[in-house]
Amino acid sequence: MAALMRSKDSSCCLLLLAAVLMVESSQIGSSRAKLNSIKSSLGGETPGQAANRSAGMYQGLAFGGSKKGKNLGQAYPCSSDKECEVGRYCHSPHQGSSACMVCRRKKKRCHRDGMCCPSTRCNNGICIPVTESILTPHIPALDGTRHRDRNHGHYSNHDLGWQNLGRPHTKMSHIKGHEGDPCLRSSDCIEGFCCARHFWTKICKPVLHQGEVCTKQRKKGSHGLEIFQRCDCAKGLSCKVWKDATYSSKARLHVCQKI
C-alpha cells in the first residue's frame, strides 16, 4: 500500500514538472518572436547601428551649416552692385540689410543683369550666356531685284548690299554707345563711360565715382589681362585702399577716393 502511494506521488511530481517546463518554453518562444519583429522593423539594424547612423546625419548637417555660415560671414553691406567685388552683386532682401552675394550662374533665376555672373545676362528671369551676335557687322537687307542706275547703267551700291558686308555705315559710326553696348575704344561710348572688357567682348561701362570699388593696377599693361574690367576712377579721384575701422578684414579692398 505504501509503495503504491509513493508511485502516485512521483508521477504527480513528474506531471507538474513537465507542465512548468512547457509554460517556460512558450514564454521564451514569444519573447524571441517579439525581438525578431523589432529587428525587422529597424531594417536589420541594431539599436547601436541606428544611433550611429543618426549621429552621422547630425554631424553632416552640422558641417553643412557651418560651411554656409562661413560663406555668409564673408558678405558685407552694400547699396549697389558697384560696391561689390567682381563676381558678386548687391542683394536687397525684403527684410534685413543689403549684402554682397555670389553671382548666379547660367540657367539660374534672376531679376536683372547684375545678378548674373560675368559673360551672362538676365533674360526672361534666367541667366543666359552673352552671345557674340552683338559684334557681327550690320548686314543690309537684299531687295531680291537689282535696278540699274539710269545715268551710268551700273548697279547701285544700295542694291548690291552683299558687296558691302563688313563696311560700317557712316550713320552708325556717329552713334555713341550706352551702357552695355559693344565698342572697340572708349571714344565709341558716350561721355562718362569707357570701353572695357567683358569676357570675350568689350562693352561700354560707367566711369567709377567716389566710394565705388575699383581695380588697382599694379603693373603697367596688366589691364589687358583682366577678364572683367572696370573703368578708371573719374577725374579728381584715385584708386586707393579702403581704410575703415569697422571692416578690418576688407583692408585690401580698393575704392575711388579724392586725391
Curated annotation (Swiss-Prot):
Entry comment, domain topic: The C-terminal cysteine-rich domain mediates interaction with LRP5 and LRP6.
Keyword Transcription: no
Main location: secreted
Disulfide bond entries: C183-C195, C189-C204, C194-C231, C214-C239, C233-C256
Reported function: Antagonizes canonical Wnt signaling by inhibiting LRP5/6 interaction with Wnt and by forming a ternary complex with the transmembrane protein KREMEN that promotes internalization of LRP5/6. DKKs play an important role in vertebrate development, where they locally inhibit Wnt regulated processes such as antero-posterior axial patterning, limb development, somitogenesis and eye formation. In the adult, Dkks are implicated in bone formation and bone disease, cancer and Alzheimer disease.
A single GO BP: Wnt signaling pathway
Annotated region described as DKK-type Cys-1, given as residue ranges: 78-127
One MF term in the entry's GO annotations: co-receptor binding
Keyword annotations: Developmental protein, Disulfide bond, Glycoprotein, Secreted, Signal, Wnt signaling pathway
Protein name: Dickkopf-related protein 2
Residues bearing carbohydrate: N52
Subunit note: Interacts with LRP5 and LRP6.
Cleaved signal peptide residues: 1-33
Modification after translation, per record: May be proteolytically processed by a furin-like protease.
UniProt subcellular location: Secreted
Family: Belongs to the dickkopf family.
Tissue: Expressed in heart, brain, skeletal muscle and lung.
Coiled-coil annotated spans: none
Gene Ontology CC annotations of this record: extracellular space
Organism encoding this protein: Homo sapiens
Chain residue ranges for the region called DKK-type Cys-2: 183-256
PANTHER family: DICKKOPF-RELATED PROTEIN 2, DICKKOPF3-LIKE 3
Bilayer-crossing regions: none
Lineage: Eukaryota, Metazoa, Chordata, Craniata, Vertebrata
Keyword Secreted: yes
